[in-house]
Amino acid sequence: MNLMDFFRRNKEPTATTAKDRLQIVLAHERADRNAPDFLPALQKELLAVIKKYVPIDDDKVAVKLERESGCSMLEVNVELPAPTKGAPRQPAATAAG
């Protein structure tokens, strides 16, 4: 190997290095998805959407995240009120747009 070959050797492109680093960061963020602030925020948003269409109590919604062998499962249990006789089957509130 002569001196010029030393300076000409192929370096890994910076784009490849950046891509590898980004993949590592994303993998760490995905691993932290079951953090304590994730589920309460998700439950709050789901509750707001459900309340647009059905009058329910806050304590009637349960959100649970389970992880098994590389697979994540989100379980949402909503206890809906009994239907009232003669009530129209339309959303409780509609957005005017």
Curated annotation (Swiss-Prot):
Keyword Cell cycle assigned to the entry: answer is yes
Record GO biological process: cell division; regulation of division septum assembly
> What InterPro entries does the record tag this protein with?
MinE, MinE_sf
User: Pfam families annotated for this entry?
Assistant: MinE
Keywords per UniProt: Cell cycle, Cell division
Keyword Cell cycle (UniProt): yes
Q: Which family does it belong to?
A: Belongs to the MinE family.
This molecule's function is given as:
Prevents the cell division inhibition by proteins MinC and MinD at internal division sites while permitting inhibition at polar sites. This ensures cell division at the proper site by restricting the formation of a division septum at the midpoint of the long axis of the cell.
The identity of this protein, by name, is Cell division topological specificity factor
- Per the UniProt entry, what species is this protein from, by scientific name? Rhodospirillum centenum (strain ATCC 51521 / SW)
